[in-house]
Design a protein with these regions (language model features):
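A conserved glycine-rich beta-strand in the N-terminal activation segment of trypsin-fold
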Residues: 60-77, 182, 251
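Active-site-proximal beta-strands of protease catalytic cores
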Residues: 79-86, 261-273, 652-667
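Bacterial Sec-dependent N-terminal signal peptides
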Residues: 1-22
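Long, charge-dense accessory insertions within large macromolecular proteins
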Residues: 148-227, 506-632
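N-terminal leader/propeptide and maturation segments of large enzyme subunits in energy/redox metabolism
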Residues: 29-40, 109-177, 289-419, 438-442, ...
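Catalytic nucleophile loop of clan PA
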Residues: 71-73, 250-264, 641-661
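Conserved small/polar residues in nucleotide/adenosyl-binding loops
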Residues: 687-691
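Catalytic-histidine neighborhood of serine endopeptidases
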Residues: 81-126, 664-665
Length: 691
């Protein structure tokens, strides 16, 4: 009776998954319980129409876009819809002061005008396969955790490599699930010729910018259009003017029926990572170390960038993409830490862990193996706490901070003898970073971050440059930075050219920027070595915790954490109550765009071109108007998504495209750790008018 009560209490604390709309499900492993729940909510498609490794199915219309976003194929000639913020870096690369596609938008009026993007690819999933037995077959009982990891990694590489050996157009990737308790093979086909077809002005595609990011109500037209190209046999090919539009296996039909409150909807895409099974010790470390470091350091860096971007168009274009990426994670970290505190996530996790402790105590088999599980986890997180915190600030300050250091590290890692395709891509990356760099801004950033890092960490973790600054430059960080940039050849086109042309008279290791890069890598290595022992035990402990949770809740319908593999989430269109006395509707209209512009007259985040405002003010929306004569812009649902889902197709019950998922809401920013059914919402861009 006591055990039954414990389980009832624990289930109320830990919902994986207690809600019909929670979960990021593997399409190739949808069980009966999940399919039943989807049908009860309104799904009208059989499972083999969602995922079928032998016949075209809905999953064949969904792509991983560049490995960082998702997309959906919507035409027989390879058109792909994704989010504007997913295509933002591509638009930026093609922009200049003379052709400001970021500000004005871009449209290719013919296929000849479509713009190539060598850095981009789209990835189609062909099939998945459970390879757990084969991977874990390489593990021996006598192995310690490091030996186990090495054996597992080797077998994962072997299994993945077998796919390409059989067919060079395919890629096999084995991923770990449930903390390394299961392993699945995904077989992909990549297409590397992806061209920009259309992008709205940023005043539409980024309307609200940082102010509205992660916020509902939302009025952002966050979409871009690209096209996939292939060779004349419809096979993957690198960019060539001779390539032709790709003809996909499956094209997502676009809904003409719209939606209403309570309508079934599902996203299919590539969510990046979640930590739903992470221990309270891991959550606390994330909050206090990596998240706080991002908040502190990026806040300093971005303030400098933003000031200069607002003052000069050429700087705005150069820095737009990197500012956008940096600020997105910066605000995310702020929101996650806020949610952890406000929603009591740590307290909920600790209560759940207390119930697991009791369950372990009452089960002899579990007690023998796991009696010290939480004690060991707590001890090992404590043992690496200070080094982990310093490393988080170190990475943000120096590896993600001054771009001169980033250039030096890329040059240090460059391999002229590598595969030609890899060499060319790396060269382009170096040249592109250099072309988007303003040295005066970078010097100011470096100086500011040297000061900020010193304030945030113990003196034990100060790299050698601080001794140099103290001894040689009288403690003046700016003087040190000025001297570094003046004496390094990497800050000049001539120096970069000498490296790229492999000039034998250029002694690269004598360059002070390269020397600094080596010092930074050395310190990073030292930090990793200091944390190696506790980190190894933490990996083991979190894996064991993941396993015991699933054994304890045997009747629960579990899903694995997101890991950048294809997932499906489902739910219904619905609003929510963010706080007492307030209710948010489930959709927004163009009326809200006009209201926000009027309310933020001097705010660049809400600046919109007069011609766009004129179109919206006219009210001539044709067939896209609803029964009130309004045109809807965005809607929300209780689907379960995370980063990487940006650009994910939002389908209705028939598998027809409603729009694209592009964001989550501020009140549920802790959703990567704990799903909050009353608060968590997916923000979607609408492609068609609701009925």
């Amino acid at each position: 009776m006591k055990l039954k009560c414990i389980l009832i209490v624990a289930c109320s604390l830990f919902t994986l998954t207690g809600q019909a709309d929670e979960g990021m499900w593997m399409l190739g492993n949808l069980n009966k319980q999940t399919r039943k729940t989807m049908k009860e909510l309104g799904l009208q498609m059989p499972a083999d129409k969602l995922y079928n490794p032998k016949k075209p199915s809905l999953k064949d219309a969904v792509v991983s876009f560049g490995g960082f976003c998702s997309g959906v194929v919507v035409s027989e000639d390879g058109l792909v819809f994704t989010n504007h913020h997913c295509g933002f870096s591509s638009v930026q690369q093609h922009s200049s002061v003379e052709h400001d596609y970021l500000k004005d938008g871009f449209v290719a009026r013919s296929r000849a005008e479509e713009l190539p993007n060598p850095e981009l690819y789209v990835r189609f999933l062909l099939r998945t396969e459970d390879v757990t037995k084969r991977v874990l077959g390489a593990v021996k009982p006598s192995m310690n955790e490091m030996e186990r990891s090495s054996a597992v990694d080797s077998m994962m590489m072997v299994i993945g490599g077998e796919v390409s050996l059989k067919d060079s157009t395919l890629l096999g990737v084995v991923d770990a699930y449930y903390g390394g308790n299961e392993f699945w093979l995904s077989v992909y086909r990549d297409f590397n010729d992806v061209r920009l077809v259309f992008a709205p002005p940023s005043s539409v595609g980024k309307f609200g910018w940082d102010t509205d990011n992660w916020v509902w109500p939302r009025h952002t037209g966050d979409f871009c259009v690209f096209r996939i190209y292939a060779d004349h046999k419809n096979r993957p090919a690198d960019y060539s003017p001779d390539n032709v539009p790709y003809h996909p296996e499956y094209v997502a039909p676009i809904s003409l029926d719209g939606y209403k409150e309570g309508s079934f909807c599902m996203t299919i895409g590539y969510p990046g990572s979640t930590e739903r099974y992470l221990s309270s010790f891991g959550i606390e470390e994330m909050m206090n170390n990596s998240n706080q470091a991002q908040i502190d350091i990026r806040g300093v860096k971005q303030a400098i960038w933003k000031r200069e971007m607002d003052s000069k168009d050429s700087i705005r274009i150069k820095y737009a993409s990197k500012y956008d990426e940096s600020s997105n994670y910066w605000k995310n970290s702020i929101g996650v830490n806020r949610a952890i505190r406000k929603l009591g996530i740590l307290e909920k996790k600790r209560e759940m862990e207390q119930e697991i402790r009791r369950w372990i105590q009452q089960n002899p088999d579990e007690r023998e193996k796991l009696l010290q599980l939480f004690t060991d986890l707590e001890l090992n997180y404590k043992n690496r706490r200070e080094v982990n915190r310093a490393q988080a600030y170190f990475i943000e300050s120096f590896l993600y901070g001054p771009e001169l250091v980033q250039l030096a590290l890329k040059i240090l890692n460059f391999d002229f003898e590598g595969e030609q395709k890899t060499v060319i891509a790396a060269l382009k990356d170096i040249v592109e970073q250099y072309s988007n760099l303003d040295l005066d801004i970078d010097k100011e950033v470096f100086t500011a971050l040297l000061k900020e890092y010193r304030l945030k960490v113990d003196t034990t973790f100060l790299p050698e440059i601080y001794h140099t600054i103290a001894q040689k430059y009288n403690g003046d960080e700016k003087a040190f930075v000025d001297s570094l940039y003046a004496s390094s050849e990497l800050t000049t086109p001539r120096g970069l050219k000498r490296f790229l042309e492999r000039d034998t008279t250029y002694q690269i290791f004598d360059d002070p920027a390269i020397s600094l890069g080596i010092d930074m890598l050395t310190m990073l290595f030292d930090m990793n070595m200091q944390m190696q022992a506790p980190t190894t035990e933490i990996i083991r402990g979190e894996r064991l915790l993941n396993g015991v949770i699933r054994r304890m809740y045997t009747s629960r319908n579990f899903y694995p954490d997101a890991n950048s593999t294809m997932r499906l989430s489902f739910g219904t269109v619905c609003g929510y109550t963010p706080f007492d006395g307030a209710e948010y509707d489930y959709y927004t209209t163009t009326k809200g765009v006009l209201e926000k512009v009027k309310a933020h007259v001097d705010d660049v985040d809400f600046a919109v071109q007069p011609e766009v405002l004129s179109l919206l003010s006219s009210g001539n929306f044709g067939r896209y108007a609803d029964e009130k004569g309004e045109m809807k812009v965005c809607f929300i649902s209780n689907n379960d998504i995370t980063g990487g889902n940006s650009g994910s197709a939002m389908f209705n019950s028939k598998g027809e495209l409603l729009g694209l998922a592009f964001d989550g809401n501020w009140e549920a920013m802790g959703s990567d750790i704990l799903y909050e059914p009353k608060m968590q919402r997916t923000i979607c861009l609408l492609y068609t008018s609701p009925s």
